[in-house]
Amino acid sequence: MIKALITKDASIIYEVINKAARAYRGTIPDDCYHDPYMPKQELRREMAIMNLFGWYEGGKVIGVMGFQSVKDVTLVRHAYVLPEYQRKGIGTKLLSHIEQMTKTRHLLVGTWSDAFWAIQFYQKHGFKLLPEKDELLKKYWNLPQRQIETSVVLGIET
């Protein structure tokens, strides 16, 4: 079941994101990975600017995904599923929910260029790698230059 997540859910969101993000260790550049991957203060800032949803099973949040409207597009933000629940359709259900909520013509997602599993997930759902990724990352995200250099953008028309 999908439910909107709110401030009081921050600790479980923190847990899901940081457990799932361990997959990045050894994959993304060492200077871009840190533990925790998303500190609590950063999570609070992110929650203030986007809508975040959780997939619940047995009363427990096991996956999270958010969206943020920026200018003329919608961004998929912070898509994570606990490792033991991955490849069971939870990410697909959350992404479908985000697509239904999208009110703009374009839905974009940024991810690490070496996170092949994430890229394949979005491609499976019709997203295409966009060649103008540097311009898009600078226009719609607020990222350090190093992350821009090591990321890709995928998009789909809604």
Positions of PLM-derived features:
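Conserved acetyl-CoA-binding loop of GNAT-fold acetyltransferases
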Residues: 123-132
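Conserved beta-strand-loop-alpha-helix junction that forms the acyl-donor binding cleft
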Residues: 109-119, 135-140, 145-149
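Active-site acidic-Proline motif in GNAT/NAT acetyltransferases
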Residues: 69, 82-88, 114
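Conserved acetyl-CoA-binding loop-helix of GNAT-fold acetyltransferases
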Residues: 81, 87-100, 124
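A short beta-loop-alpha structural element at the N-terminal edge
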Residues: 1-15
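Conserved GNAT-fold acetyl-CoA-binding loop/helix
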Residues: 15-43
